[in-house]
Structures are given as structure tokens and as C-alpha cells.
Amino acid sequence: YRDINIEVAEKRTGSLNIGVAFSSIESVYLFAGITQSNFDMYDWSSFVGGGQRFAINARVGFETQDASISWVDPWFLHRKLAFGTEIFYSNSTYFSDYYDQQNYGFAISLRKPIGELDYVKLEYRLEQYRIDAEGNAPIFFWQQDGDYLRSHVELSYTIDTRDAQIFPRKGGKFEVLAGYSGLGGDVHTYNFGVNGSY
């Protein structure tokens, strides 16, 4: 037997993005984000080395302002089970000339791989909506004016064969989902969906 010494140099796992961008909704908007893909929630001395993903993102424009803080542990309880949580805020005026919409809340999720390319995900989302109707809005929009609490749970199954998530060159993504809003709150709806891209 022989001993083999291997030196490993860890690449940078954190990033900071600040910039200006354009979109069809906003003529121009500012954005900023901090991401650490080797975060460690349980190591308060350095907060790195745990393989978790932590991100803070914000965007400010004339029509939208939003911000979010998210954290994902891909090996929750030392199992092949991803646990994620997110806190978010959004203020939008581009939906209609007759009303503005503000929403904020949090979400928690569990994602379990089935095979190499597919997984199931269970998510719970609690979200506060505020609809502000404008003075010249039709009566329909004034009937929706006010605050609404939405408590939503959703189960989805996804097959993802893409070679990359940001700029895929081949493969596709297929998703089937079912959700229910009504575990408390003011909204009581069902939703079912099938999404796909190739």
C-alpha cells in the first residue's frame, strides 16, 4: 500500500451581482444579488462549508419592486432530501392601470429525487395580498379592493432532462402539479397544471 496525497483547491462559491437591465415591462430597472452556494447555517463562526445555498435578491424599477431571501439545504437531516425556505416581497403596478398589487409572505418546501432526472416537491406558501384600486377604476376592481391572506399547499412531479438550467442547449422539462388554497386564510381554490418545455 502507498499513501497518496491529493491537494484540492476550493473554487469561489460566493457571488455579488449589481447592475442595470431592461425589460418589456420596465424600461430600465436596477438589481442586486448575493449568493453563497457553500453556505452553512449551523456554523456561526464562518457560515461557509455546509454545501447549502443562500441568496438575497432585490430589484427596483418604475413598475415593480421586489426582494427575496432564500435558503436551501440539499441534504436535510443527512438524507437525499432538499429543504428550502424563502421570504419574499413584491409591489407591482404593471398588471393594470386600474389597481396596484402588493404581496409578501414566506414559503417552505421539501424536494425528493426519484431518479437521476425526476423529483417530487411539496411546498407550502403563506402570502398576504393587497389590492389598491385607483379612483377611476370600474366597479369590478373596487369589489376586489382590500387585503387577502392565501394559504396554499402544492404537490408537483418534475422530469428535467436539460443539460443546464440557465442556458440549456438540449433536453426539456415536464411538470405535473396540483394545489389547494384554503388551509385558513381568505382564498379557497384548487389548481391543477401541466407545464412543459423542450
Which stretches of residues belong to each language-model region?
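Gram-negative/organellar outer-membrane beta-barrel architecture
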Residues: 1-167, 172-173
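Transmembrane beta-barrel strand/turn architecture of Gram-negative outer membrane proteins
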Residues: 104-110, 172-182, 187-198
